[in-house]
Regions:
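Extracellular fibronectin type III
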Residues: 2-20, 117-144
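Short, solvent-exposed loop/linker segments at the N-terminal edge
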Residues: 43-49
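Solvent-exposed serine/threonine-rich low-complexity stretches and specific carbohydrate-binding patches
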Residues: 79-93
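Surface-exposed, short loops/turns at beta-strand junctions within beta-sandwich domains
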Residues: 14-16, 89-94, 100-109
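Proline/serine/threonine-rich low-complexity linkers at boundaries of modular beta-sandwich domains
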Residues: 13-33
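Solvent-exposed loop/turn segments flanking beta-strands in beta-repeat/beta-sandwich domains
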Residues: 35-38, 50-83
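Intrinsic-disorder/low-complexity, polar/charged segments enriched in Ser/Thr/Lys/Arg/Asp/Glu/Gln
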Residues: 3-5, 52-54, 97-99, 109-111, ...
């Protein structure tokens, strides 16, 4: 699994207090998790070529507006304003402040782009990270424990 993280700070009158980050320690094969946790993932039994990635979200407070998206495009690190404009759209608003799950196909380049707006309406640091997951690196589904998204 390859990970590359780059943070950007926006030039604005007032810097936001929310500096969102995403992290994970392991991923699971989605079909295997569906077999052991049908209550939450039973509809994914045919998704053998997908990873279930439990993500931890840090740097935001309840009441912040959290935006994030997963994309497969190659990021141009020189165009941070373009990525802010793309992620900070209503369709990317998520009411998740602590954790989330991502279902990602194996052996594809992904980028997670996220930003949060604090209670004063100011954007914090733009977060980006690249992911490339291998099926052979999946953790044993017997060790999977569902955590409620919040």
């Amino acid at each position: 699994t390859r990970i590359f993280v780059k943070e950007f700070t926006f030039m604005s009158d007032v810097a936001g207090s929310s500096n969102i980050t995403f992290s994970y320690t392991k991923h699971f094969n989605l079909a295997e998790v569906a077999a052991v946790d049908a209550e939450h993932w039973g509809n994914y039994t045919a998704y053998d070529n997908f990873a279930l990635v439990p993500m931890t979200i840090n740097g935001v407070q309840e009441g912040d507006i959290v935006y994030y998206m997963v994309d497969t495009r190659v990021i141009d690190w020189q165009k941070e304003s373009q990525w802010l404009a793309e992620v900070a759209q209503e369709k990317n608003i998520k009411n998740q402040y602590h954790n989330c799950y991502m279902q990602l196909e194996y052996e594809k380049d992904y980028i997670i782009v996220a930003v949060a707006k604090d209670k004063n309406g100011n954007f914090g640091t733009l977060f980006t990270t690249e992911l490339y997951l291998y099926k052979s690196d999946a953790a044993d589904a017997a060790n999977y424990n569902y955590v409620e998204v919040k």
